[in-house]
Structure formats: structure tokens, C-alpha cells
Design a protein with these regions (language model features):
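Internal, hydrophobic beta-strand segments that form the core of beta-sheet-rich folds
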Residues: 111-125
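Short beta-strand elements
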Residues: 125-144
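Mature extracytoplasmic domains of secretory-pathway proteins
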Residues: 18-86
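N-terminal export/targeting and maturation segments
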Residues: 1-24
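Beta-strand-rich interaction surfaces with strong enrichment in secreted/lumenal proteins
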Residues: 42-45, 91, 105-107
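Short beta-strand segments within Ig-like beta-sandwich modules, predominantly Fibronectin type-III
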Residues: 90-100
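Short amphipathic beta-strand/extended segments with alternating polar/hydrophobic composition
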Residues: 8-16, 80-84, 131
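Surface-exposed, short loops/turns at beta-strand junctions within beta-sandwich domains
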Residues: 96-98, 105-115
Length: 144
């Protein structure tokens, strides 16, 4: 996954995820990981009204389950205070007629720093396995 702001990009990793896939004839395997989110500013924005883009570098359509922004972190580094629901638009990225990625566009105001929580799910990664893929991302934007 990549975050694009001000014509610059940075990679974003998930801090929590679960994936299921086929593991041979009639069986499935799952991979689950859980960590601690870090909201270190991943990118600097040069104006109050930012228009970041997030690219999911896979052909499966992500479904945004929750996307929230916060202005504060507590003493332990967790988001605190009122949350703002972020509205975003999702579009396909095509190359030679094939979907190669999905672009999530959103607008936000960055006065000083903003901290974001994004939870997504993906349609069945393997039709033989009933679980969807899920991932949680945390990132920050900082005003220059």
C-alpha cells in the first residue's frame, strides 16, 4: 500500500491483518498478525486542505469498513478525542485494460498534525475459503 501526498509517496504497512487462502486440496490456511499502531507522520502536507491518495496494490477491490481522523494522541500514543469520519472515493487503476490497483482519494484539513485509522476488508481471496482478508492501517499527516 502506498500513500501519495504532494506528489511524493511513502509505503504504508498494516499493523493488524488476517488473510485466508487455499492450502491444497480441500483445505485452507490463515495468517493473522496483530501489532501496535504507530501514528508517526508519514507525510508532510503543504497546505491546510490536503488531498492524499492511498493506493492498494492488488486487483481485489477493498471495502472501507471504517476511516477516522483524530487531532490528538494520548500519553501512550493512542488516538484520543473526537473522531471525524473521513469520506473517501474509491476508483480502479487500470494498466493494459486490467485492474492493477485501487485508489482511495479523500480530503482533509491538516492544521498541525492529523492521525488516521483505516480498516479495510477484501473480497474472498480464495473462493474455497470462507474468510475475507482484513487489514488495519494507521498513519499521520503533518503540516509543513
Amino acid at each position: 500500500m502506498e500513500l501519495h501526498v504532494n506528489n511524493e509517496q511513502t509505503g504504508l504497512g498494516s499493523w493488524s491483518y488476517s488473510w485466508s487462502s487455499g492450502a491444497g486440496r480441500g483445505s485452507c490456511s490463515s495468517l493473522v498478525a496483530d501489532g501496535i499502531p504507530t501514528y508517526e507522520p508519514d507525510a508532510k502536507v503543504d497546505s491546510l486542505h490536503a488531498r492524499p491518495r492511498i493506493y492498494f496494490l492488488r486487483d481485489q477491490r477493498p471495502r472501507v469498513q471504517s476511516f477516522r481522523a483524530y487531532s490528538e494522541l494520548d500519553e501512550n500514543g493512542w488516538t484520543t478525542g473526537p473522531a471525524e469520519r473521513i469520506r473517501a472515493r474509491l476508483s480502479r487503476v487500470r494498466q493494459d485494460g486490467e485492474v492493477v490497483a485501487w485508489k482511495l482519494r479523500f480530503r482533509t484539513e491538516v492544521v498541525d498534525e492529523r492521525y488516521f485509522d483505516l480498516d479495510v476488508s477484501f473480497e474472498k481471496l480464495d473462493r474455497r475459503c470462507g474468510d475475507n482478508g482484513e487489514a488495519s492501517y494507521a498513519f499521520g499527516l503533518e503540516r509543513e
